[in-house]
């Protein structure tokens, strides 16, 4: 995994972090890369320092999701698709969950809607803010180009507040994530929306076709820590993974399962790390977020 850093402040901070991880935790899989050697990591432009973490991994998220679903069903659980929950009514020692097709009585409810929570469960809604993020995939690149932009076949990201992240697929497509929106609407053309972010790093790909573009909604918290907890002893929830959901949502699921089954000190520890609520309530949360995100986007453009 390679993180490429933009701006002098970020370089200083991450040099210190590399030193801290190596000294305090004896973690020798991470190293810093100064500017003259960055071309060994990628042909991307506009970067001043890099961090390489040889102890990290990247994976295929869809295959991982399908694998988790298979494991759940193998263990005896049932999965019901197209069963959107419309209401959760908490009683003294159970909850009544309503869908379009059924009403279910449950002793415990696990709520992990993240950016898709909407108005389903107001008690926890103000702890998160939904935002949209977008990804494109190029046409298959020739071997020389692929080796030039990502010779280590690593997963890469930069240090901008509105982060860009990318990797190569098995058939040498560049899969590039970049750009955010803060309304409930997606861009008319995701490929047109993301292309400038890609070309800012790899101008050499200006003539490369973008074959696919897609997006989704995630949830952030104010301090970027996941928000875990239990409401009235019945509804366990995990949300606000802030772009790190692939590893941390799995961790949260394990903690919640253990907590429901037999109690879990680690769940109690995580749920004790309270996240601050977004100000403004249901009506003003989003405008305040847009103002803040535009400010930090401007800092990105100014190289701060």
Q: Where are the language model's segments positioned?
A:
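Single conserved hydrophobic/aromatic residue that forms the stacking wall/gate
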Residues: 1-7, 11-12
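Active-site substrate-recognition segment that forms the wall
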Residues: 85-87, 92-95, 102-233
């Amino acid at each position: 995994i390679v993180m490429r850093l933009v701006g002098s402040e970020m370089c200083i901070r991450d040099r210190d972090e590399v030193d801290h991880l190596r000294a305090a935790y004896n973690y020798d899989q991470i190293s810093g890369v100064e500017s003259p050697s960055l071309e060994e990591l990628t042909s991307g432009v506009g970067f001043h320092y890099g961090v390489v973490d040889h102890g990290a991994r990247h994976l295929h998220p869809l295959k991982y999701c399908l694998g988790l679903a298979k494991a759940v069903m193998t263990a005896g659980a049932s999965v019901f698709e197209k069963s959107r929950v419309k209401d959760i009514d908490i009683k003294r020692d159970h909850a009544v969950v309503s869908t379009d097709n059924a009403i279910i009585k449950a002793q415990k409810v696990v709520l992990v809607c993240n950016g898709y929570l909407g108005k389903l469960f107001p008690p926890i809604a103000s702890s998160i803010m939904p935002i949209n993020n977008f990804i494109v995939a190029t046409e298959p690149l020739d071997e020389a180009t692929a080796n030039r932009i990502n010779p280590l076949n690593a997963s890469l990201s930069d240090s901008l507040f509105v982060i860009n992240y990318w990797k190569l697929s098995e058939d040498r497509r560049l899969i590039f994530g970049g750009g955010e929106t803060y309304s409930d609407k997606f861009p008319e053309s995701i490929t047109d929306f993301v292309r400038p972010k890609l070309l800012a790093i790899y101008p050499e790909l200006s003539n490369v076709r973008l074959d696919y573009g897609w997006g989704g909604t995630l949830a952030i918290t104010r301090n970027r820590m996941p928000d875990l907890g239990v409401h009235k002893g019945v509804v366990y929830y995990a949300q606000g993974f802030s772009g790190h959901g692939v590893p941390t949502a799995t961790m949260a699921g394990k903690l919640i399962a253990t907590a429901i089954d037999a109690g879990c000190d680690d769940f109690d520890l995580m749920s004790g790390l309270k996240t601050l609520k977004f100000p403004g309530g249901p009506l003003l949360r989003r405008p305040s977020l847009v103002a803040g995100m535009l400010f930090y986007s401007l800092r990105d453009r100014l190289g701060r």
